[in-house]
């Protein structure tokens, strides 16, 4: 604490804000001092209507995408809050979700790198080669997801469970549900890795932002959430069965994204 008072949730919020401010300052300073690709000050202050139109055309769908996706995931907690044993269910979901985010953080790094690679290939005019590159990178991400899934299951469901669970004040029911959720997450990681790399990396890198908007949100809003409402609030299935719904999004998203990937319609030269 360094002598500072305990701020609780307020402290967590302040720390998050400060980390984002530091992140912005570091990124902006690097961009400002970069010599290989110098930041043009006049382009920031007076970008021009043509550049502004392009920016809005490709950034607006991404903004809508992230807003809808974040809102959709928040609705999962709302649904759980209206179910039996809601406190145990939400506690298990919070812990399992954080562990899964820790394990899949590398997936988003891969997706960001793929976006750069795809955009570079399209920018250099390699429109034919980028199709095979995009496919290869997506299936590489799928293979990486298999490794991550096995690691998550081995570490947190079997080997490290006796050491991790006691660190949190979970009831016996919450611990059992957390284990079930982690098993579901571990099974879904290969599809999670594939679909994230495909949507965030390949489609967005190829300028196919409208398709990525639909592919990213349709499975969540028209698949996962309605099925969760049906099973959890109407049929009132056991919580262990309800946990299987966590995999639905990726089961629906992956084949839709694979179809778009094979079509080649995601390749757009926006330079």
Name every feature range the model reports, one short phrase each.
Residues 23, 68, 72, 110-114, ...:
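Residue-level signal for transmembrane alpha-helical positions in Major Facilitator Superfamily
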Residues 26-29, 44-75, 102, 106, ...:
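Hydrophobic faces of transmembrane alpha-helices in multi-pass small-molecule transporters and flippases
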Residues 27, 72, 76, 114, ...:
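Hydrophobic/aromatic residues in alpha-helical transmembrane segments
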Residues 2-59, 118-188, 231-271:
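Short alpha-helical transmembrane segments in multi-pass integral membrane proteins
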Residues 210-222, 229-237, 244:
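C-terminal structured "cap/appendage" subdomains that terminate the fold
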Residues 1-7, 67-98, 102, 120-121, ...:
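Helix-terminus/linker motif at the lipid-water interface of multi-pass membrane proteins
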Residues 77, 90-156, 193-212:
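Small-residue-rich hydrophobic transmembrane alpha-helices
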């Amino acid at each position: 604490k360094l002598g500072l008072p305990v701020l609780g949730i307020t402290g967590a919020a302040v720390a998050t804000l400060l980390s984002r401010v530091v992140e912005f300052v570091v990124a902006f300073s690097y961009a400002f001092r970069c010599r290989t690709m110098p930041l043009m000050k006049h382009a920031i202050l007076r970008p021009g209507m043509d550049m502004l139109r392009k920016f809005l055309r490709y950034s607006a769908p991404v903004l809508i995408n992230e807003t809808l996706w974040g809102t959709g995931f928040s609705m999962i907690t709302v649904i759980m809050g209206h179910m039996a044993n809601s406190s145990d269910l939400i506690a298990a979901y919070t812990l399992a979700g954080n562990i899964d985010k820790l394990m899949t953080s590398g997936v988003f790094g891969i997706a960001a790198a793929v976006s750069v690679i795809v955009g570079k290939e399209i920018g250099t005019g390699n429109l034919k080669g980028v199709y095979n590159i995009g496919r290869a990178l997506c299936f590489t991400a799928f293979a990486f997801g298999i490794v991550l899934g096995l690691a998550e299951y081995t570490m947190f469901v079997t080997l490290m469970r006796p050491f991790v669970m006691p660190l949190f004040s979970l009831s016996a029911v919450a611990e059992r549900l957390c284990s079930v959720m982690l098993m579901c997450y571990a099974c879904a990681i290969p599809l999670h890795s594939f679909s994230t790399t495909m949507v965030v990396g390949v489609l967005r890198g190829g300028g196919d932002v409208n398709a990525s908007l639909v592919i990213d949100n349709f499975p969540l809003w028209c698949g996962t959430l309605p099925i969760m409402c049906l099973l959890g609030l109407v049929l009132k299935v056991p919580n262990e069965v309800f946990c299987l719904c966590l995999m639905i999004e990726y089961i629906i998203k992956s084949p839709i994204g694979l179809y778009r990937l094979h079509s080649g319609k995601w390749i757009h030269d926006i330079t």
